Amino acid sequence: MARRPRNSRAWHFVLSAARRDADARAVALAGSTNWGYDSDGQHSDSDSDPEYSTLPPSIPSAVPVTGESFCDCAGQSEASFCSSLHSAHRGRDCRCGEEDEYFDWVWDDLNKSSATLLSCDNRKVSFHMEYSCGTAAIRGTKELGEGQHFWEIKMTSPVYGTDMMVGIGTSDVDLDKYRHTFCSLLGRDEDSWGLSYTGLLHHKGDKTSFSSRFGQGSIIGVHLDTWHGTLTFFKNRKCIGVAATKLQNKRFYPMVCSTAARSSMKVTRSCASATSLQYLCCHRLRQLRPDSGDTLEGLPLPPGLKQVLHNKLGWVLSMSCSRRKAPVSDPQAATSAHPSSREPRPCQRKRCRRT
């Protein structure tokens, strides 16, 4: 087959039409007539955009992921059957998993893409308020240096489209670089790591099968341990696995990105602690009692000490340290990847344990 010219604008419009047709079929299957979702048929201004060398995205990418919510609240699994994306989450403000009142950091209003809007004291970020023409991203207000850092991101809207991701990145990541390109922004280079809602882990442009998919209502936890140099992901407060190692002496920002129109995410927890003997003891206690609702319950400790530990290290005492069985990779997510990129391979993950 003859190879088409890379910079042909005619091909851009041909592929745009094909993508619009694929998206229209996807909406018909989803039972929706007025979706404002991230359609890869939106035209990009980039002539040399490598994303246009792919085939039209698979139909399921336009259908929100359901059945992966942290709770059973009404509205967390109905998005794909609503007639409008706006009505899908209007009036259904679920607060499950949002117990914390103090936050170590929130989203940074000065370091974000133009297609983002902050609310809820800068803890909630909304992407592409009307329609989407690319990828929007944002980072936290605090650079994460030495110590233990843990945060949770709740998916507060339908999760669908080219990609919605949670991860970390250095200050070198350009958050507005792909504002006219639909892509998986986090993990495209060596400066960032990103977990996609499809279950793929991205880093240096490589993709590995890492977890099951997540959707509206899912809570994605991230633990950056600069003492051991590890990055660990959690889903609905269950450990998925260690995504990266050898991260000592590096500094990162928490980041998220989305290509989906009218999508949103919310910081429900952001904590930090020094790597002290107190932290290591609490972490070890949690490992020894992984299924206990209250790790300190029944232990011969003074009530005052228990309260202090809960206030300072409650996130450690509630953290799941047992790794779930690795799920089977989603073949639909793999087929929508860039054909010239490497195929997703099984991720060799370490157990969520500390020595």
Swiss-Prot record:
Residues 37-56, 327-355 are annotated as: Disordered. Pfam families: SPRY. Gene3D superfamilies: 2.60.120.920. It is found in: Nucleus. Pathway: Protein modification; protein ubiquitination. GO terms for biological process: negative regulation of cGAS/STING signaling pathway; negative regulation of epithelial to mesenchymal transition; proteasome-mediated ubiquitin-dependent protein catabolic process; protein K48-linked ubiquitination. Residues 264-315 form the SOCS box domain. Disulfide bonds: none annotated. GO terms for molecular function: ubiquitin-like ligase-substrate adaptor activity. Its main location: nucleus. The keyword Cell cycle does not apply. It comes from the Eukaryota. Residues 85-274 form the B30.2/SPRY domain. Substrate-recognition component of the ECS(SPSB3) complex, composed of SPSB3, CUL5, ELOB, ELOC and RNF7/RBX2. Interacts with MET. Substrate-recognition component of a cullin-5-RING E3 ubiquitin-protein ligase complex (ECS complex, also named CRL5 complex), which mediates the ubiquitination and subsequent proteasomal degradation of target proteins, such as CGAS and SNAI1. The ECS(SPSB3) complex catalyzes 'Lys-48'-linked ubiquitination of nuclear CGAS in cycling cells, leading to its degradation. Recognizes and binds nucleosome-bound CGAS: ubiquitination and degradation of nuclear CGAS during G1 and G2 phases is required to promote low intranuclear CGAS abundance before the next mitotic cycle. Belongs to the SPSB family. This is SPRY domain-containing SOCS box protein 3. The lineage of its organism: Eukaryota, Metazoa, Chordata, Craniata, Vertebrata. The gene is SPSB3.
